[in-house]
From Swiss-Prot:
Renumbered residue ranges of the record's region RNA-binding: 33-159
Biased composition (Basic and acidic residues): 201-235
Name of this protein: Nucleoprotein
Keywords: ADP-ribosylation, Host Golgi apparatus, Host nucleus, Phosphoprotein, Ribonucleoprotein, RNA-binding, Transcription, Transcription regulation, Viral nucleoprotein, Virion
Annotated spans, Dimerization: 231-334
Amino acid sequence: MANQGQRVSWGDESTKIRGRSNSRGRKSNNIPLSFFNPITLQQGSKFWNLCPRDFVPKGIGNRDQQIGYWNRQTRYRMVKGQRKELPERWFFYYLGTGPHADAKFKDKLDGVVWVAKDGAMNKPTTLGSRGANNESKALKFDGKVPGEFQLEVNQSRDNSRSRSQSRSRSRNRSQSRGRQQSNNKKDDSVEQAVLAALKKLGVDTEKQQQRSCSKSKERSNSKTRDTTPKNENKHTWKRTAGKGDVTRFYGARSSSANFGDSDLVANGSSAKHYPQLAECVPSVSSILFGSYWTSKEDGDQIEVTFTHKYHLPKDDPKTEQFLQQINAYARPSEVAKEQRKRKSRSKSAERSEQEVVPDALIENYTDVFDDTQVEMIDEVTN
């Protein structure tokens, strides 16, 4: 029966022209959110020529529901009043969901590319779309991903918002700086007149200021708290790494203490990536209740050994940083070379950021994957 749907079979397909038509699309300001992170397409490439016909992300739905479409999102940024085109992003939606929820499988729509796994049912799924408070999922596929496709990773919405607010604050500061300078001149003349009047009355303002400063320093010194870890008279396994060389407490790097490159060992908790590395370490309760423990006598002490296995997400940048620290002492030249590469990439990224300084009030782009904040144009142009 037609309303029951049919199994998808690509056996009769001979072309890759999918999801293109001559009709004009409409702008939409209320686009449902995709379950997955988007794909950013390399500029100059055509998504429909590169996308495999079974290019359905893994992780949601049953076998019958592995069917849907990729929806194009055109983007731009305003730079000094000029529109600067940005690479397209493509979001995946299951059949019967998203901005084209009423479309049938293989309907010709601008900015839409239909995909399905062999054996999926060509009827609307009941999977819906992502809630605004839920994070989008990382893209994973069974087959090979075209080189022109960049699979995006999650970025913090709070970070994006804070960058926008920071730009706004910076602009406000620059606008008010001129007013402040003119006001300061008036304030200086008033201050000079007051000081002259006090001097005539025999009040020594300089000595009073000096006494006030000395009292402030005394108060600040008394409130300063020493944050250096107290490691004296503690067992090695109870010590805490502070700022500075950790070999004082844990010894030089070796086969039995093989974590940390020269920078991390020399700087301890003040090393640049220490907070990210610490996030990859299990908690005390995980070690206590999720480890295999053994013990044996060692003279007048007991030697305790535990084995703990856990998994880190492969696509998390912190995981790569963490893995580079394992056995780093045994390959110092390789580690130094990799660190130079990272610094070079970081400087290149900073330069590219400085080249484009968008106006936060007219910017129509966000690096947080929220489709509702970006203009959608369904028309495909060659």
